[in-house]
Amino acid sequence: MRFIKVFLFVLTGIILPVCLSAQTVSGKLIDENSQPLPYANVVLLSLPDSVFVSGTISSEDGTFTLEATSVNQIVKISSIGYKTVCKAVSPVNLGIVQLVSDAQMLGEVVVEGNLPVTRMKGDAMVTSVENSVLSKVGSANDVLTKIPGITKKQDAFEVFGKGTPLIYINGRKLHDLSELEQLNSDDIKSVEVIRNPGSRYDATVKAVVRIQTVKRQGDGFGFNLRSSYYQSDNTDLIEQANFNYRHNNLDIFGSVYYNQMESWQDFTLQLEERGTKVWNHDMKSYGEFYSKMLSGNIGFNYQLNDNHAFGMKYKSGKTLNERNPLSKETNINVDNVFYDNIKVHSCDNYYYDPDHELNAYYNGQLGEVNVDFNADYLQNGKSSNSLFQEISQTSENRDVHSVNNVKNRLVAGKLTLSIPLGGGTFAIGSEVTYTHRNDDYINEENYVPASYSKIEELNATGYAEYNRSFPWGDWSLGLRYEHVKFDYYEDGRHIDEQSRTFDNFFPNISFSTQLGKVQAQLSYTAKTQRPTYSELSNNVFYSDRFTLQKGNPTLRPTIIHDLTLSGAWRFLQMSLSYSQTKDWILNWGELVNEDASLTMLSQRNWDKSIPMFTAFLSASPKIGCWAPMMSVGMQKQWLTIDYFKESKNLDNPIFTASFNNTWELPLGFMLGLDSYIQSAGATQNIYSEKPNGYVNVSVRKSFLNDALSVELRGNDILKTNRMSYSMYSGDYYLYQKSVWDRQEFAVTVRYKFNTAKSKYKGTGAGDSQKSRM
């Protein structure tokens, strides 16, 4: 609390003097189609000698603010492809400023595939995609794999040293990563990576990826089609169709998406539990996964005038068929003496309710106040029926039937107000989210007791942020307050000891500057990581006759303090981070019986603060038709745990390296060769035993002036994308080695006609709670 008081005192000391002495020049930039114009250069010059006083860049919504120290000054506004505009600083509110195209300048712009430029802008590393080689690599999925600092692991992306990011497209938060496959790379304008998000974002968010799309011109109807065929040991299919109709200020859009996926996993597992006896399990397992999913969305955006826009988007989807058959055989020894051999055949069948997701937004300018409001509703549910058939060599056989029903509902609203203040921008906002979850588990044979649980959570947030540019750098200060009320019910009864209330403050501060051609930023943030709703469930799940699984309703949120230094120079980007993590949530195995014959897998908070250091360096030069992107990274933690009554140090660093290459060739051909490798090392109480990685190759050919494209791709051609790791936890040890059918050949055909990207500006609310579902 003392730190919070000092922080507020410093914040007041910075804001108050500038409010008393400065006049704020503000305005909003638009293009010829009345669309906001971001990234334009806005500089304040003194008269009559035109000496530079201060400068800034217009934000995503086209707004800008500057501090004028005299009426004898002018504002100069410039952007590539537009005529430069100069305005007097009187009146200080310049209102709407429209920039018109400069035909001569546009004629000189090279629009062939050039090197994607990564620069630092505010709190983000921004990579330009439009008119670069990245615009031709396929989908947004393919683009993100080539962005410095982003790595794709299995079916998710990670920002190095920060974990899984929130991903936004035009300010709208992604809840389904399949949308990245639906977004064509040539529709992307830029990708921004924020490694230390400020108070505007939920305190659980440790990294953000913002994708901005190209704003298409003109009215009319457009569509784009995509069909993909993937052949590994199984066959996967993706079919999609997007449409857009635009007339004057009305924009109507929608899409239909179908995904059919089959896969397998072959893994070996070794378990050891030590109680009064020592149990060893050697398991070989083979599992398959089948899924078919159909989804669609429709929405509209209406631009009332230059200052007001509103819209709505509805999305629905349903998994048509999903099942997971599994076969495994386990040899069990007790004190090095044979105990049993058990063969298991199981199958999980999943039945999904249709998902419903609705977002409505309003974005407007009321005088000098920018208003951004979002409201969200989300509903989903699923039921799983599981059958385990256990055949024992020395004990009784078992048939185990279980049913798990889960239903989620969420309502959220978010409001942000931004105003010019003291030569900078002051933003204040609030977000309220209500979540309701039912989770029932029933075991017909009563090997584990039936449970009927309910979770209700109210998250109320207030935040404030101040940004100001000086000739020597940019400051940003913010503070976020979060009130979380968590109520847990079991069998219809409120469980007081597992229901809690949290009140936390999360400050952030950052400073950005430019020294010659070097851009640098130093930032501090306080973050949290809340347990998922399944981790909070007290339901007990049957894994086998020796192992049960459940959540832990007593879990506390993790608190993270992070200090990050980022820099950029020409084609080089660098990041250094140091963090302290308190109450880290670890997967943990505990003995139920003293003789270790039964183990419960759950989660726990680590009661000591864990320090971590990460370093990252990337380079993206251009050599003729060759555009390489090379990166190296290191992550090291300092963690010691109790393991089999002894201390186990898990401080081995993890090293990563990637080398992505793109060659642009004549006749519309483009070649790609991407590789990634990760060393052995420790993360939390898990140690990766062996290096793993992949090599992907691709060739793309465009036709009909790029309206039609065909891509051939080979993924994991060396079949090295596999995993082997150990988990250490008290009296329980697990080793797993997994192989997937990720080596595959793919063909993708895309066709587009008069495409126009949606102008939808909804950003969503309750994002972190949606992710926890």
Language model region names:
Residues 43-45, 78-82, 94-133, 153-154, ...:
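Short, acidic, small-residue-rich periplasmic hinge/interaction motif at the N-terminus
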Residues 67, 146, 172-198:
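Short acidic/polar hinge/loop motifs at secondary-structure boundaries
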Residues 92-98, 108, 140-143, 177-178, ...:
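N-terminal periplasmic accessory domains that precede
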Residues 212-227, 266, 282, 294-298, 381, 485-488, 516-563, 576-597, ...:
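Surface-exposed extracellular loop regions of Gram-negative outer-membrane beta-barrel proteins
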Residues 295-321, 342, 346-491, 514, ...:
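Face-selective signature of the C-terminal outer-membrane beta-barrel domain
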